[in-house]
Amino acid sequence: MHQSSWKSRRHRRRGHRHSAWFRQHGSNERKDAGAQQSPQGSSDGHGEAPSTSSTAGSSSVPDLPGYYFDPEKKRYFRLLPGHNNCNPLTKESIRQKEMERKRLRLLEEEEQQGKKIARLGFNASSLLQKSKLGFLNATSYCRLAHELQVSCMQRKKVQIQSSDPSALASDQFNLIMADTNSDRLFTVNDVKVGGSKYGIISLHGLKTPTFRVHMHENLYFTNRKVNAMCWASLNHLDSHVLLCLMGIAETPGCATLLPTSLFVSNHAAGDRPGMLCSFRIPGAWSCAWSLNIQANNCFSTGLSRRVLVTSVVTGHRQSFGTSSDVLTQQFAVTAPLLFNGCRSGEIFAIDLRCQNQGKGWKATCLFHDSAVTSVQILQEEQCLMASDMAGTIKLWDLRTTKCIRQYEGHVNEYAHLPLHVHEEEGIMVAVGQDCYTRIWSLHDGQLLRTIPSPYPTSKADIPSVAFSSRLGGARGAPGLLMAVRQDLYCFSYS
């Protein structure tokens, strides 16, 4: 009995010292609360990606194993691993709470601050004054003017008209893709009952002050996942859409050429309804259509350790063996080259003049440290932009095979996310896995704009975007389209 009472007294003394330390530490935190105001970056909202650390806002507080410090309540809470409570406190929930707090703050800044400045010291009046004084040439003036317009774009919700309004309320956007002239938008929607549905949105009505567009339905329906898609110019420019569909059960994957003339009320002048063509190509990760005269009416598909180049007219195929899965592809227009990005981080070009026998077909080799998710060839075909699953975006010089610029701020861990390069405006757009849309300057890699998602951050609700120099056709203004869940938003130049 004496031994048990001695243990009890020792336990009370130990608990008293432990609780006294917590009270003293909490008191100090309350005293220093006014002095520990951490700056949140510039007022234009161009901050970095949300931190993945659960103690990002309390770096001066010691990290206690098994405890979490709440900067709002100024106290520690115990983490409960494996607890079967309906709302356990976990690091993931803490991180989601911090990300949601930052998203709401950025949305509030977007609504309150109509005019923003992409670069310090540059606004409309200063640009005009420097141009008149001869400090800026015409090229620099146009580039900086575009950057200023991008920083001032405001979000407007687009009204979508359809013959089936009930479907618009339930079907969620998965992918969107603008055509070359930016007067059509091809969409892939996830249907509530399962599967996918395709549509084409006419952008001719996308004008201020009423942003109203029409969705053209079609009867084509598939329950298979779309791995990749691109526009195909078979009969004329952007006459078809090339889709890579994933196989299910005993049905193998395929590459499908879907004529846009099959869509209701979407027949161009003199355009007859086309025929849907399917090619049995299982397990395609990526696809690209060739506008090169040396590979006319051909498309490529990136498979597991293989690249296929297929002629639509003759059905002839060329196969090129690779050492890794090919996740992204793009044809050059003037040079007879097909650029490929692999899961291993390698970027290589296939010389289309060579046959698939031998090793002479590999023309250029570049390397990233992670899986390459997107490659974009610039207009003069001397540089290539590439991004990977580590969030790295690099601009490569194809003549010297060296990286000449890196774009910071992109967030990606494992998603297949595209890049959108627009040289006319001098910008590059990418959506991160954190659901933030970021816009950079092609000229120097400056982060010009960070746009939060209208919905809470979720890996299932990553926005799909399309930027165009002329939204709605030849007379349209530059702008950005963002599709997330059932909604379509437009960010246009004011």
Swiss-Prot record:
Chain positions of WD repeats: 367-406, 409-450
The UniProt entry, under InterPro entries, shows:
CUL4-DDB1_E3_ligase_receptor, WD40/YVTN_repeat-like_dom_sf, WD40_repeat_dom_sf, WD40_rpt
Per the record, the GO terms for biological process are: protein ubiquitination
Which segments carry the region annotation Disordered? 1-65
Residue ranges with Basic residues bias: 7-20
Q: Which domain of life is it from?
A: Eukaryota
Q: Which UniProt keywords apply?
A: Repeat, Ubl conjugation pathway, WD repeat
Where is composition skewed (Low complexity) in this entry? 51-60
Identify the Pfam families for this entry: Beta-prop_DCAF4
| SUPFAM superfamilies attached to this UniProt entry | WD40 repeat-like (SSF50978)
Pathway recorded for this protein? Protein modification; protein ubiquitination
Q: How is this protein annotated for GO cellular component?
A: Cul4-RING E3 ubiquitin ligase complex
| Oligomer and partners | Interacts with DDB1 and CUL4A.
Function of the molecule: May function as a substrate receptor for CUL4-DDB1 E3 ubiquitin-protein ligase complex.
This one is known as DDB1- and CUL4-associated factor 4
Q: Which organism is it from?
A: Bos taurus
Report the gene name.
DCAF4
